[in-house]
Structure formats: structure tokens, C-alpha cells
Amino acid sequence: INQLSHDFVDIVQNRISELNPDMIIAGTDLVINKNGDIDTLCDLGLGDIDILAYDNNRKIVYSIECKRINFGRTPTEIRNERERFIRDSRNQSSWISKHLRRHQWMSYNKEAIRSYLELEDTDFTIQSFVVVSEDIALRYLESTDISIVTLDELTTML
């Protein structure tokens, strides 16, 4: 992962802290797999959570994917954007499908999340979304199972 992507994760993290000072940022770039930050029985190919945050007042765990992008202006770029975000040839490695699989795993494995966050119980919901560094045409052309928001729209998710 390049430095600009890491910088964007930091920007999103700082914005979350500004919008909700009580939000707990539990970690960034957390790997979910066997012997990872969040341990699983085997490597499931879930990748990492860019930002894991917890709102204790609302009992919500946030799984936030951060994408620093700079494309999608010409028809070819929009097509490529669509494939990267939503529709790859196997529908398994697009950014949205990976984030959705991670969200589903977290929803079915709340005990692992509870343990990582050191919470008393699993009485919380999980919300997942993608924050993009700039608006993309794709958001207006196709619906997705995971919300895509810009940095300026982050307040609507928290």
C-alpha cells in the first residue's frame, strides 16, 4: 500500500475524530486472518480493515474502507472504475465485494470483534462503508450493497 493511501486513511481517521470526538478509533490496517490482528481459524482472504471504530453511545462498530482515487473521467476510466469497485470478472476481488465479505464475516463473528475491542458483550451493530477521496460517477450509475461516500459526506454515516 502506497504512502498516499496511508495518508488518506489518516485524513479519514482525523475527520472521524473531528466529527465525533467520543468515537473510539480501535485501529487501522487491521488484518483479519489466522494469527492476524483479528484472529480467525484460517486465512479467509478478507484482507484488512482500513479503520475500525466504535461508538459506545450508539453501540455501533464501524468497518471503514478508505480509497484514494483519481480516475473515472472518460468512458474507459468509468468502465475501469466500475470493474475495480463493483464488477470484476469473478465478482470476488472487486473492492465492494471484498468489503461486503468482510462485513458479513464481522456480522457472523461478533465475538471476535468484541474480543478485539475488549467490549463486555456483543450488543452492537456493525456498519460498513467506503470513503473515497473524490466523488466518482459510479455512485450515480449503480447501486451497491455497501455505501460509498466522499470525505465531505462522512458526517451522514456517523
Name the predicted role of every residue range.
Residues I1-L158:
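Intrinsically disordered, low-complexity Ser/Thr/Pro/Gly-rich regulatory segments
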